[in-house]
Amino acid sequence: MQRLFAGKLRFAFRHFPLTEVHPWAEPAAEAAEYAATQGLFWEMHDSLYANQDELGLPLILALGRALGVSDLGLRDALAQRTFASKINDDFIGGVRSGVNGTPSFFINGEKHQGSFAYEELAAAIDARLHAGAAP
């Protein structure tokens, strides 16, 4: 999408950990935020997502190590819940915006109710652009 709508699209990621479904979702989000301090947010996010069914502290730390994330720093950030308030703020903001699951997409502040298929999202963004509203 970002390539298709280069210069016309702003992408904002928000955490929405569903802890009742994934007990390690919140620590995983915190780990991704710590990795972001080292420029490795998306790499950590993708590794955590790919391994979401096996997550636990040992695996989160191992994934971080594999990416070159500081092991001691990550342990500290998780133990002290350094990024917990940011994750909570993202979650509360999502609830207030009508998010009740993931993934959720908003186009120009309006929740996309259709399919998440590439073609449908692209068509919805394109329709907004042609209506004069920047997504």
Protein language model features and the residues they cover:
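C-terminal cap of thioredoxin/glutaredoxin-like
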Residues: 1-2, 58-135
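Structural alpha/beta surface segment adjacent to cysteine/selenocysteine redox centers
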Residues: 1-65, 126, 131-135
